[in-house]
From Swiss-Prot:
Highest taxon, organism lineage: Bacteria
Bridged cysteine pairs (disulfide): none
Protein name (record): Uncharacterized HTH-type transcriptional regulator YdfH
Pfam families associated with the record: FCD, GntR
DNA-binding region: 38-57
Listed PROSITE patterns: HTH_GNTR (PS50949)
SMART domains: FCD, HTH_GNTR
Domain HTH gntR-type: from-to ranges: 11-78
Key words of the record: DNA-binding, Transcription, Transcription regulation
GO molecular function: DNA binding; DNA-binding transcription factor activity
UniProt cross-references to InterPro entries, sorted A to Z: GntR_C, TF_FadR/GntR_C, Tscrpt_reg_HTH_GntR, WH-like_DNA-bd_sf, WH_DNA-bd_sf
């Protein structure tokens, strides 16, 4: 039985459906290989099929689902190629962003990062993984704002969907939030010192964590992964 999900009346419906389905796929609430029905999703959100179809197209563009005309849609397995390429591109962008942010950061921006890190700590203490996941993203997005490069975050956001699935799966034991928070604190410390070399090293170490995580996660969930 499909449980209806209420949407906010203000933002575009297709964008809301996309965000909710993306979250469900990234959090593995909808597992790799699961069929997706336009009809069932439209019933879930109590909408016509058109906004659902538009959300499906965007999910496909992000590499999260496969749309096969006349054969239906399904959630893609986690592509090792996309994880490798997405991680490589993200590291190149974010290391450059971090170095630039170190030369531009203001005291008020330091305070913003400090508040974010405090909220991360609270989320960990309360075992609120979904909140930590969002705060982790917000931390990295703040760095692109400090570096005055919104395009960098837009690019990262478009390519990191597959990597996000590995990130979320790693929280349990491979890359626990406590360790990720320590790495965020190292990045913040280097930013406070305006040390471009140190912040780039800290960011590199932080982002390489996904490469270590994916090996173990794949061993434990081999049916969810593909080489393509």
């Amino acid at each position: 039985m499909t449980v209806e999900t209420q949407l906010n009346p203000t933002p575009p419906v297709n964008q809301q459906i996309y965000r909710i389905l993306r979250r469900d796929i990234v959090h593995c609430l909808i597992a790799p290989g699961t069929p997706l029905s336009e009809k069932e999703v439209s019933v879930r959100f109590n909408v016509s099929r058109q906004p659902v179809r538009e959300a499906f197209i965007k999910l496909a563009e992000n590499g999260l689902i496969q749309i096969r005309p006349q054969r239906g849609s399904y959630v893609n397995k986690i592509s090792m190629a996309q994880v490798r390429n997405g991680s490589f591109i993200r590291q190149a962008i974010e290391c450059a962003v971090a170095r630039r942010a170190a030369s531009m950061i203001t005291e008020s921006q330091c305070y913003q990062l400090e508040q974010n890190l405090h909220q991360q700590r609270i989320a960990i203490e309360r075992k609120q993984l979904d909140d930590f996941f969002e705060l982790d993203d917000n931390f990295h997005q703040l760095l692109t704002q400090i570096a005055d490069c919104q395009l960098a975050w837009d690019t990262i956001e478009n390519l990191k969907a597959t990597v996000d699935r590995v990130r979320y799966m790693s929280f349990d034991h491979v890359s626990p939030p406590e360790m990720l928070l320590r790495q965020h604190l190292d990045i913040f410390s280097a930013l406070q010192k305006r040390d471009g070399d140190a912040v780039e090293r800290a960011m590199t170490q932080h982002l390489q964590e996904i490469s270590e995580s994916v090996r173990q996660i794949r061993q434990e969930n081999s049916d969810w992964f593909s080489e393509e």
